[in-house]
Amino acid sequence: MKKNFVSEKYVSNRTMPINLDPDHDILFRNEYQKNIEKSYYFNLNNILIANNHLFKSRFFSLEPQYFKMDTENWNSTLISIKQIRDTFLKGNKPESIEKGSWVIDDKSFNFFHFMTDVLSRISMIENELEEYPILLPNSFKNKNYILEVLNLLQIPTVFYDENKKYYIKELLITSHAAPAGNYNKYFINRVKNQFITDQILDHKKSYPK
């Protein structure tokens, strides 16, 4: 698996809030300085999507950090056994998708996570999206802000049915841009700039000043 790195590791230093109560400093002490690791993406062939989880060779769970926000209690062995059981009991034949990109986890439907985590992961692969459209579950269509952002930023997207299984012949998978609750400065600024282009500003001209 060849990782394509798209950002460098750096240390994010935060300034203490000016209204911080000294008695509360212990609550934030670990947040003043954070290591932001290198971000990357890679390609895998014949990946199975089932219940918004990723499996290789039909049954074996991919590393959870690519589709889970919190991996502390994740057990890949148990998930793989469950996948084997479900495959033989239900026997539903997976449908096929030629190419796609994976940019979500189990928190991505949330406004905050979509606007920061997901859009940062999309920004990492902006030059690959025409060939590898992002894959999103149909349930995301119920979130108007997601549809509006996808349309506004013209992000190529393929929606899939969460009740079905899919073989992705070639899947481009992104790392998280930063740990939960943190941001990679390269990508969050790129996302910001996408929202203030002339194209986006044109949508505001009809509003009264």
Question: Where are the model-predicted features located?
Answer:
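The feature primarily captures lumenal catalytic ectodomains
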Residues: 1-209
